[in-house]
Structures are given as C-alpha cells and as structure tokens.
C-alpha cells in the first residue's frame, strides 16, 4: 500500500533518563523541539530510543507521550512496535494503534534467525492484527536477520497495510532494487550517512539520528529532495557529513546521547546497561565536533 502519511523527515527520538527512570518532562520537550523545527514524523522507541532495555510499560509510556505531544499538529507518530516474538510484536502494534499512533515500525525479529518464509509469516500476522500502516525495519547488523528484497516486495504486494521498509543495511543497491520494482513503496533511509543517495533514488524520507540535534537541517534536506531540488539537498547533506560520522563512533545511541548532553538538550547522561558512556577519547571527539555546529539547548 502506498502511504502519504509516513514520509519526509523523521526523527529516531532518544529516550532521556533521569535517576534511572524515563524523564517524561524532558522527553516531551525534545519532541516539541522537533515539531517546532519542521520534522514530519516522530519515531519513538526504536533503536535510538533504547527500546531493547525498556520494559513494556515504559515502551507504552513513550508512545503515549509522543502521541499526546503531537496532537493538534501535522506531525505523525511512527511507533516502534517490534519484537522477536510475533505475539509480543502484535501486542505492541495493537497498543500503538489503540492509543493514536499513525503507523508502526516493526524491527526484524532478532536472535531467532528465522527463514524468509518465517519473516513473511511474522509480518503477515502483524499486518493482519492492525489497520494502521506497518513499516518493516531491516537492520541486519543488529538483528542478525536480513529481510531480503523479495520478501519485502512480497509483503508489500500481499498485505494492504504494509507500506514499505526502513532500510538500515547500508545497501543502497537494495533500496534501488526495491524502488525499481515498486516505485510507490515507502523506502526510507535508516542511516544518516546514506540519506541523500536514498532520497535521490526515489526514497520517501529518512529516519534520522542526527535530527535529534539538528532537526531543521534534516527537515530541509528532505524537503528539498522531495521537491526535486537535489542541489540544495546535497549541500545540506554535505554540511552534516562530519556530524553524521561522529554519531556512529560507538554503537548508537551512545554518541547521540553524549552529544545531546554536551549541547544542553538533556539534563543527565544516562543509559541502560549494557550500554554505557563513550570512552573519554570518543567523548572528546564528539565534544569537538558538536562545537562546530550551532545547537541551542533547551
């Protein structure tokens, strides 16, 4: 199914913690900042939102805050709702739908190492359980599971509410293959380093980590590309190159949270174990890079 809702600039929003718990006030402020700076879609509780170390109750709280904060605006909510257990993924997807999310992002089932047929059946069950759009999330470097292009195409053609895929494999050829066969599919970049080439090849948008820091830049990058002005889009992409690179000097979301703390966007630098603070050397590199960009704290 072609989607007109989930497109453009999307932020993979972090989950701020304070004294070991979700900083709900800080979370709402971060979302409002994204809205004010032109972001089209908020994506809570994905990889960047540390969904893997949140309880199901915390997961639900993040979705509720995102939906409530976006009410009365044109900004959509694409709620993270994946699991390596199909029944759990269905439960999260239903919760997201029932609480007002516009669509769900469903990560490939990690650790289990299912076959392509298993992936097909997993996503078919999820799609049949809800009416809102479902965006697949392919990130084999983290899940150990690769949703092959043929499987994505099959699901897109057979399931009316599967709209496409967040492609975070880093494989631009994969994205071109998908779009050459299904030009109306929602293929979005899941890696900031390849945002521009995916947009230039017909991608519908980006789910960005960098947008946590510079939402206005990412919004303009997408707006220009979707209007066909690839010269201006590329210029912005090139401006973000150094920042995009440093934000993956360690595993996401370790660098982005450090960068946001340095920029004054979050009050405390807290992670959930086994994630921890970056090395002193990398923290210094992040700090030096952040100083080159004009980022206003909250």
From Swiss-Prot:
Active site: 137 (proton donor/acceptor), 166 (schiff-base intermediate with substrate)
EC number(s) reported in the record: 4.3.3.7
Site residues, Part of a proton relay during catalysis: 47, 111
Keyword Amino-acid biosynthesis in annotation: yes
Catalytic reactions of this protein: L-aspartate 4-semialdehyde + pyruvate = (2S,4S)-4-hydroxy-2,3,4,5-tetrahydrodipicolinate + H2O + H(+)
A Pfam family matched in the record: DHDPS
Record localization: Cytoplasm
One GO-annotated biological process of the protein: diaminopimelate biosynthetic process
Pathway: Amino-acid biosynthesis; L-lysine biosynthesis via DAP pathway; (S)-tetrahydrodipicolinate from L-aspartate: step 3/4
Residues noted as binding pyruvate in the record, renumbered to the chain: 48, 207
A GO molecular-function descriptor: 4-hydroxy-tetrahydrodipicolinate synthase activity
InterPro entries xref list: Aldolase_TIM (IPR013785), DapA (IPR005263), DapA-like (IPR002220), Schiff_base-form_aldolases_AS (IPR020625)
Keywords, ordered alphabetically: Amino-acid biosynthesis, Cytoplasm, Diaminopimelate biosynthesis, Lyase, Lysine biosynthesis, Schiff base
GO cellular component, one term: cytosol
Function: Catalyzes the condensation of (S)-aspartate-beta-semialdehyde [(S)-ASA] and pyruvate to 4-hydroxy-tetrahydrodipicolinate (HTPA).
Binding partners and assembly: Homotetramer; dimer of dimers.
Similarity section: Belongs to the DapA family.
Entry protein name: 4-hydroxy-tetrahydrodipicolinate synthase
The species this protein was found in: Campylobacter hominis (strain ATCC BAA-381 / DSM 21671 / CCUG 45161 / LMG 19568 / NCTC 13146 / CH001A)
């Amino acid at each position: 199914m072609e989607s007109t809702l989930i497109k453009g600039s999307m932020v993979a929003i972090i989950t701020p913690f304070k004294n070991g718990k979700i900083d709900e006030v800080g979370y709402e402020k971060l979302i409002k900042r994204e809205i004010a700076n032109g972001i089209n879609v908020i994506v809570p509780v994905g990889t960047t939102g540390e969904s893997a170390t949140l309880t199901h109750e915390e997961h639900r709280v993040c979705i509720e805050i995102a939906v409530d904060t976006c009410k009365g605006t044109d900004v959509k909510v694409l709620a993270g709702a994946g699991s390596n257990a199909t029944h759990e993924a269905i439960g999260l997807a239903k919760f997201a739908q029932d609480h007002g999310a516009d669509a769900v992002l469903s990560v490939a089932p990690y650790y289990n190492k299912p076959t392509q047929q298993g992936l097909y059946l997993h996503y078919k069950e999820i799609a049949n359980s809800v009416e809102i759009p479902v965006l697949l999330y392919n990130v084999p470097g983290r899940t150990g599971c690769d949703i092959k292009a043929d499987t994505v195409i099959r699901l897109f053609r057979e399931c009316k509410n599967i709209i496409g895929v967040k492609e975070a494999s880093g494989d631009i050829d994969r994205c071109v293959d998908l779009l050459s066969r299904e030009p109306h599919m929602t293929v979005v970049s899941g890696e900031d380093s390849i945002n521009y080439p995916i947009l230039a090849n017909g991608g519908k948008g980006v789910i960005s980590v960098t947008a946590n820091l510079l939402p206005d830049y990412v919004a303009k990058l997408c707006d220009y590309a979707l209007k066909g002005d690839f010269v201006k889009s590329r210029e912005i992409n090139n401006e973000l190159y150094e920042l995009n690179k440093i934000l993956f000097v360690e595993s996401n979301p370790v660098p982005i949270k450090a960068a946001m703390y340095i920029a004054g966007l979050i009050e405390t630098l807290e992670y959930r174990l086994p994630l921890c603070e970056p090395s002193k050397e990398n923290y210094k590199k992040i700090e030096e890079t952040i100083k080159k960009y004009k980022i206003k704290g909250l």
